[in-house]
Amino acid sequence: MKIVLTTVQAPFVKGGAEFLAQNLNNALIKQGHESEIVSIPFMDSPLDLIEDHIVAARLFDLTNSWAGKIDLCIGLKFPAYYIPHPNKVVWALHQHRGAYDLFDTEYSNLKNDVVGNDIRKIVINADNKYLHEAKRIYTIADNVTKRMEKYNNIKSTPLYHPCPDMEKFYEGDNEDYILMPSRINITKRQLLAIEAMLYSKTKTKLYVMGKSDTEYERDRMLDFIKEKKLKDKIKYFDSVSQEEKFQLYAHAKAILFIPLDEDYGYITLEAMAASKAIITAKDSGGPLEFVIDGKNGLIVDSTPQEIAKAFDEFATSEMMCKKMGKDSKEHLIDMEITWDKVVKELTR
């Protein structure tokens, strides 16, 4: 089949969504399909652009190309999953969360005012109207499925996929640090983790790894570390190679991943692939679909004090690190998350 994957792109920004699209594209080609990624630009600031992008998505026609008829369209991201096609399935990474669970919070530029409520209504109405055009609706995680049902009363099916380079992660000898990988972003809550180090009673270090979405967020984090006099407790890795990333995972005592209501979270799967236990929070969303409290990680309240307690538990017990790390890898194997399964379901 000739298949197009519709998604959005913010120039010079690359994260989990871009990796997913590329890996799905590769998996489809490996299965003998002709597949292309079709990206449209997207910005949600100024707010008027949101409605403009919705309208633009509806004006595209992907029924045919110069290479002939397009057999299947797989919609991945808002508002690209609105692009019309007679044979479309949606595999939603997430909806425009600023209009839903993040509305009128510090994590969204949509506020409870006239403009914010108008744009929110436009987004919700568009989802209610256009998502139903798809023959089947999938999401990348049960957390996304539950949100879609809660806010739109739209049924969908969770479909898990492997993280990039999952087979390349490995287990090494533990060194005296706990790793917090993620791009530097307010929803990933690095500042909360840094604050937790004020309450840690061990000498174990926190390694923070990830590029920042903006210079402002990076500088704010570094200033916070300096202000709290935590330079001896925290080490920051801005840009690392893939090999360096694998090494940092391999030698960590555990992985700290405490995002706010994450959709899916590659970090969790990466930790499991590297035979590492995960510290996550009760409001972290996606990771809770993989972490079993007390078996392959710890699920704690999202307070600096509780995070510090979990941090210190792993810091002081090598046996706990090894046992939970082993259980983590076994749990991942048991879940049988493969691209072959994803392709089979999306193209059936």
Where are these regions (language model features)?
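Aromatic "clamp/platform" in nucleotide-sugar-dependent glycosyltransferases that forms part
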Residues: 260
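Short hydrophobic beta-strand element within catalytic cores of glycosyltransferases
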Residues: 277-281
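Membrane-proximal helix-turn-helix segments that form the acceptor-binding/catalytic region
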Residues: 108, 113-137, 145
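Conserved donor-binding/catalytic core segment of Leloir-type glycosyltransferases
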Residues: 170-188, 194-201, 206-208
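Nucleotide-activated donor-binding/catalytic signature segment of Leloir-type glycosyltransferases, i.e.
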Residues: 218-240
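Conserved acidic donor-binding segment of nucleotide-sugar-dependent glycosyltransferases
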Residues: 293-294, 298-305, 313-318
